[in-house]
Amino acid sequence: MQNGTEDKSNIPARSNDDVLPPLAVRLTMKVMRLIFIGKMFAYSFVPFPPFKLLTFDNTVGWFVAYSAIVSIWGFAVWMERGYRHKINLLPPRCTKIRCSRCNTRIRSPNWFKYKNWLYFFLLYVSLTTSNLIIQLASFMTEMSRRGISVPGTKDPGKRDYLGLIIPMRFIGAFIHYMTANLFKEYYLHNGPLEKNDRPSTDEKTSENETL
């Protein structure tokens, strides 16, 4: 049994990095983060400016290339956000006591990376497909409004593709959300492997036994 005074010699001194920023700064950062996320999701619902510059001589290959470029841009933005989150944590650590991702990373780190990058690839293909369908549907809608015959339709003035565009925009926004969350989780669990990656039960019980 120890006396009323505790030995504080082993307690590390608080550094300047441990001090939380002022409340106004934290609120401002949260508002800016929400504005950024809202702006990113807005791109899923607002047509891109190049749509207005399209002519009726564009080929399907041009649409595919443009969709791939747009998807790369969206992917790069979320990748940069996830990497910035990783830099702020240094090194990234998961705070869950039981985490399947951490167990997979420790047991088979190569499979952890391959599995996540496979998810990234599938999300990228899904985002490119969503952008491509939106572009083609918007383009055909504009052709129908101008009275130009669309392949596979008999009445060009009565065909409207808005019923296809709106669901695809919601799907695109959901893909953006999945991509952002996957990058965050990947960087959070992809830290360097160490022996004491997680506290053992013996260490926890030894801490509880001290009175």
Swiss-Prot record:
Membrane topology: Multi-pass membrane protein
Principal location class: endoplasmic reticulum
Pfam families the UniProt entry points to: DUF4668
Gene Ontology CC terms: cell periphery; endoplasmic reticulum; endoplasmic reticulum membrane
Keyword Glycosyltransferase: no
Cytoplasmic side, ranges: 1-33, 80-116, 184-211
Keywords on record: Endoplasmic reticulum, Membrane, Transmembrane, Transmembrane helix
Transmembrane segments: 34-54, 59-79, 117-137, 163-183
Topological domain spans for side Lumenal: 55-58, 138-162
Localization per record: Endoplasmic reticulum membrane
Protein name according to UniProt: Uncharacterized membrane protein YPR071W
Source organism of this protein record: Saccharomyces cerevisiae (strain ATCC 204508 / S288c) (Baker's yeast)
